[in-house]
Amino acid sequence: MKSSKLRAGAVLACTLALTACGGGDDGQLAIGGSFSGVTKTGLVLTNNGGSDYAVVPTTSGVGNWFFPNLVETDSKYNVEVKSKPDNVETCQVIAPTGRAVFATNRVDVACTFKKHDLGGSVANLKGELVLVNGADKVTIPAGATSFAMAKVPQDGVYGIAILTQPAGQTCTIANASGTMGAAAINNVAVTCTP
């Protein structure tokens, strides 16, 4: 008798726990996940061609999202990208399809920023010059008239600095810092004297 009461209590506890997690018979299950690479508005996700959701961007570009419309228990979901921010090249949905048995928070969306060239001109360089932009380091040989750094994500900041001056010369940089727009930056100017 005592063990049957314990079993009944355990079943009740499990049922209540499942209902609280979205696993009950009411079918009110949330579909969502995480996102990365979203710093601007424009990412819209859709489930089965409807139930659109505009992801709210974050400064860091990462966060979580959930469709506001809940789905029925055992229904199929198919998450797709309807539109993407203008500073993004592509957005990939990871684990986009499934069947809603419990609330789902594992439909992740990974967006890749557009990247653009960063470079410019060099004047009167007689020795070797080393430039840096964050972790990117470029060695420019004597006599060079131009240079290129690693591509920078759109809307990302850049700041080119001189790490090593050429022997016997002093070089300065014009237009060394800014924010990458929708096109390449090629007006950075390095001038060396004498």
Model regions and ranges:
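A short, amphipathic beta-strand motif
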Residues: 29-37, 118-123, 160
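Short, acidic Ser/Thr/Gly-rich low-complexity loop/linker segments typical of extracellular
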Residues: 50-64, 136-145
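C-terminal motif of bacterial Sec signal peptides marking the signal peptidase cleavage site
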Residues: 17-20
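Short Pro-Gly-centered beta-turn/loop motif in secreted/extracellular proteins
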Residues: 64-80, 146-161, 166
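Bacterial signal peptide processing site
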Residues: 22-26
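Structured interaction patches on ligand/partner-binding surfaces of diverse proteins
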Residues: 58, 82-114, 165-194
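Short, ordered, surface-exposed loop/turn motifs in non-cytosolic proteins
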Residues: 38-51, 124-137
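Bacterial N-terminal signal peptides that target proteins for export
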Residues: 1-10
